[in-house]
Each structure stands twice: as structure tokens, then as C-alpha cells.
Amino acid sequence: MEEDFNIRDHQLTSRERDFENALRPLSFEDFNGQDKVVDNLRIFVKAARLRAEALDHVLLHGPPGLGKTTLSNIIANELGVGFKVTSGPVLDKPGDLAGVLTSLEPNDVLFIDEIHRLSPVVEEYLYSAMEDYRIDIMIDKGPSARSIQIDLNPFTLVGATTRSGLLTAPLRARFGINLHLEYYDDDILSNIISRSAGILDVPCSSQAAGEIASRSRGTPRIANALLRRVRDFAQVKGSGSIDTEIANYALEALNIDKYGLDEIDNKILCTIIDKFKGGPVGLTTIATALGEDAGTIEEVYEPFLIKEGFLKRTPRGREVTELAYKHLGRSLYNSQKTLFND
């Protein structure tokens, strides 16, 4: 029986997070890929250490699963300071933010994931914390209300977002270091898979690692998740070692095609072709037709489909490309003929 694998599996459960943490590099030396980003961070971190001061605030942005959390942890490790993690949706009110900020030791790193989802009132409190290392808190209500100023230890805020366009200009301006993470090439992903296989103590040939890498959508998190699934097939259907044959068998069973597209990716393309004659069509309409969340399609699936040339954005909406027709075995001519006959 086939088991579908889709990208939403990587909104990590606690067990999956433990697995990912076991594979997470802890230093710049061990981090594969993102060479320009890592090289710049090495310089910034070393300079901050030489001056014995907090590193400038860092904004990391790019698609999910490319290493934003990992790099944040590495920054703290390389600085030799504490590392605290939270996320935009968790910081619901100013008191939540104040509790986190006042717990920081000098020069600690505070990582806020999904920083674009901070509420406006919490974001405003963050401004003075980032600029002046202080916050103003209101005590009591009504006529007896008063503001007290709380001084904070110097700290580095590392904000991560998959949707940098949603950040307000005032918040973006307060990050002294702004870095974009790109998708990884297959050679780098193959190295990551081989390293992870070694940590998991599962033999994996370089050819098999390359095969898994080629279907990992340029994303280390997906590469490690696929390795975990292929390991299951190797233990149950094979000898326990991962070779090209068992890798291909597992990936086919998981409905991951040679481009790394899963069932949802192909449904998106098929829906645009079959129901909307290839487009253009609006994102909300696509989401409604699929019964999916528009934000998930835009954030998780669409970037890779556009990068690989299966989909394009136009002022009038999304359109599939000729490559998508070829990939799905559909006729572009028939679709256009139907369009003009309507």
C-alpha cells in the first residue's frame, strides 16, 4: 500500500523536532550550503566577539526548511552565549514579550520564528527593546495607570520569516543584518544526507544519497525527512542499507516524482489545467477548488513550483507553464483549443 508524502508533514511534531535536532549542525564548520550567508555571519560574529558586544539584530528570510533555526542556534554557539526560542504567534501580548526579554543574559540570542506574525502591539514594544535595550510597561488601568521603564541586557534578536514581504518597514529597518536563504543544490543536499545517515548509523551509498537529494526540493528538512522514510523501507523491505534500488522503491511508494513533486504539487497543477484551462486563476480560487489553505499553497508549495518552472505568477493570477503540461502528459494544444472554443 502506498503512503503519500507531502510537504505539510514538515510542520514539525515534537518527535520530528527531536529527530531534526539530532541532525542539526552546531557550528559554521559543520553547516553545509548557504556559503555567502555563512561567510558573512562568520565575519559579523567574530567582530562582535572582538568588541565583546551583542551582535547586531539579524533577519533571516527564505522558504521553509532551509536552516534559519539552525543558523540562529549556530550564531549563539559561536558567540558563546545563551539561546532562547519563541515564535510570533506565541507572543500574544506585551507581557509575554517582557517575560522573555527580561530573562535574557548579556549578549544572549533570542530567536523569534514567524516574526511576520507578531501582533502590532507586541511589535511596537519590540522597537525600543531592539534599539535601546529597554521596554516601557503600563501598570494598572484608568486614572492610576502609569508607565515604568525596564532596562534590558544587551541582546541579539534573530528573526526568521518565510514571508518577508509581510514585515512592516519599521520592524525591518531595525535589523542591522538582513540575509536571504536560497534553495540548496543537489550536491550539497547529497552531502547533508550522507552526514545525516552517518549520525543515524544507517549505511547509505553516495548514489542513493544523490537520488534522495534530487527529490528533496532543494530543502534540507525535506531531505532528512525523506532519508528517515527511506530508512524504514530499507529496514523492512531490504537489508537495512540504503542503495539506489531501495531509495527509488521507497520514493516511488511515497509518490515523490523525479522532480521532487508530491501529490499536492501535482494536484495544484492538474487543477489549474483541468478546471481553469491552464490559468490565469487567482490563488484563493485554486485553494477553494483543492480544499487547501491559500497561505499554505503560497508559502509551502508555490515557491518551488515557480522555481522549477512549472508555474508562473502574472498580474491576472497563476498560470501553469508548458513544462507542467509535459510533466503531466497533458496537451497544451488541446487546452488552448478548449479555451478558444468556449
Swiss-Prot record:
Q: What is its EC number?
A: 3.6.4.-
Q: Which CDD domains match?
A: AAA
What keywords would UniProt list here?
ATP-binding, Cytoplasm, DNA damage, DNA recombination, DNA repair, DNA-binding, Hydrolase, Nucleotide-binding
Amino acids binding DNA: R313, R318
> Catalytic activity annotated for this protein?
ATP + H2O = ADP + phosphate + H(+)
Top EC class, one word: hydrolase
Question: What positions does the entry give for ATP binding?
Answer: L23, R24, G65, K68, T69, T70, E131, D132, Y133, R174, Y184, R221
Q: Where is this region: Head domain (RuvB-H)?
A: 258-342
Give the residue ranges for region: Small ATPAse domain (RuvB-S).
Answer: 185-255
Where are the annotated segments for Large ATPase domain (RuvB-L)?
1-184
GO MF terms on file?
A: ATP binding; ATP hydrolysis activity; four-way junction DNA binding; four-way junction helicase activity
> What is the superkingdom listed in this entry's lineage?
Bacteria
Q: Which NCBIfam families match?
A: PRK00080.1, ruvB
> What does this protein's UniProt record list under function?
The RuvA-RuvB-RuvC complex processes Holliday junction (HJ) DNA during genetic recombination and DNA repair, while the RuvA-RuvB complex plays an important role in the rescue of blocked DNA replication forks via replication fork reversal (RFR). RuvA specifically binds to HJ cruciform DNA, conferring on it an open structure. The RuvB hexamer acts as an ATP-dependent pump, pulling dsDNA into and through the RuvAB complex. RuvB forms 2 homohexamers on either side of HJ DNA bound by 1 or 2 RuvA tetramers; 4 subunits per hexamer contact DNA at a time.
| HAMAP family, alphabetized | DNA_HJ_migration_RuvB
**What is the similarity comment for this entry?**
Belongs to the RuvB family.
Q: Report the protein name in the record.
A: Holliday junction branch migration complex subunit RuvB
- Provide the taxonomic classification: Bacteria, Pseudomonadati, Bacteroidota, Bacteroidia, Bacteroidales
